[in-house]
Amino acid sequence: MSDGQARDLMAQRFRGFLPVVVDLETGGFNAQRDALLEIAAVTLTMDAQGNLMPDDTHAFHVRPFEGANIEQAALDFTGIDLDSPLRQQVALSEHDALGEIFKPVRKAIKANQCTRAILVGHNAAFDQGFLNAAVERNGIKRNPFHPFSCFDTATLGGLVYGQTVLARACRAAGIEFDNASAHSARYDTERTAELFCAMVNRYKNLGGWDLALKEQGMDED
């Protein structure tokens, strides 16, 4: 399969949507009120054999928006130090962080001949809710992600491996997971991307995708 054929397959595999893995670390559970503190995204690509794999990672520290609530319990859970000199030096505003995430996502959509990105996340509704709230709060008109459709690796992990916790699902898939590194947006996104790819590829290798195409009358035969 050529690179062009791989791009065609990616465009067809998820009905024109490009899966992009996203993780957000936040100051609580309320998307309207609580701060967005970290955001990371991993774009995916497909090799000549039709296997899905992680491509590029983009990750940013985010300055809390004005008036944002931050629960101490959330900081204790994530280990984020808001007073870290390094964090204060590199953190971006929500608007700029979203812009830096959306640019490579749009580029990947175009490169893979897709029409839109679809968010992949572990407990994806949480990340999607915070992402949509931040987009609205910052008046961003062109969100490359579908506003409500998503792929949830907690649900898929339960289906494929009988595990819904990210660390346990990764280990069931043969993916190393370091608990000490968890709850960093970059780390969690990269592990979630590996997990999603492993499940999609497992389904393909077991013949599920070919069967789905055949049942829909879309197989080459």
From Swiss-Prot:
Keyword check for Mitochondrion: no
Role description: Trims short 3' overhangs of a variety of RNA species, leaving a one or two nucleotide 3' overhang. Responsible for the end-turnover of tRNA: specifically removes the terminal AMP residue from uncharged tRNA (tRNA-C-C-A). Also appears to be involved in tRNA biosynthesis.
GO biological process per UniProt: DNA replication proofreading; tRNA processing
Record-listed E.C. numbers: 3.1.13.-
Recorded family membership: Belongs to the RNase T family.
Keywords: Exonuclease, Hydrolase, Magnesium, Metal-binding, Nuclease, tRNA processing
Residues annotated as site: Important for substrate binding and specificity: F29, F77, F126, F148
Domain of life according to the entry: Bacteria
Name listed for the protein in its UniProt record: Ribonuclease T
UniProt organism field: Chromohalobacter salexigens (strain ATCC BAA-138 / DSM 3043 / CIP 106854 / NCIMB 13768 / 1H11)
Record-listed Mg(2+) 2 binding positions: D23, E25, H183, D188
Assembly and binders: Homodimer.
